[in-house]
């Protein structure tokens, strides 16, 4: 059983949790962390980029109120996934049944948490989710700011990526010691019928780019190759050297995101391998 010291000190002043009290303690923890969070679990995703893995949608009340994408480019607010998100909001399972489903996943099963929605906003629920995962590889991204909580989740084998709004923000988030991903211009996505060679040429020869403070950014491989998250798993583990993964703006609101990024904050300089750099062309 995973222990929650802050709760144990409140319920058991001696700091000890006797075996006869386990059921009672779990009930108290459930009461203390009760929220209206709802979830939809898809056992085998049909998402082309994810691949055939389990995925979870969390209700919209898990999203931070200050998320910059709220109404300003969040892909989950429109399109087919918005219908599934509404299903989670209206008729999704509650938190405890979700945890039971996660515990039943195969031992080494990669899965995706939060194709819409975010992590539980309270730390106790976050750590219960992390404990239920039991060290499985998982794809998790958050716009939340409970950085100490995410470190604790990481220690339980629940690897959390924090999402940056632009590359300057990515530099700030990198100082937390957590894995970072960042939204970048849709120019970094390979265009339909564009060859890989032409794509590389358009971006200056190499795909590697840099933040203002010199941290390495690489585009999500699924944005320019036929790979899937199941094949890649780059975001499911810590990345050597703190490499930041860039996700090109996508979805029906990508132009809106590009406009927000038009100040250049998410158009990092491209390393041509010749000691110089160029800027990708401006978004249309």
What do the predicted segments below correspond to?
Residues 2-284:
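Class I S-adenosyl-L-methionine
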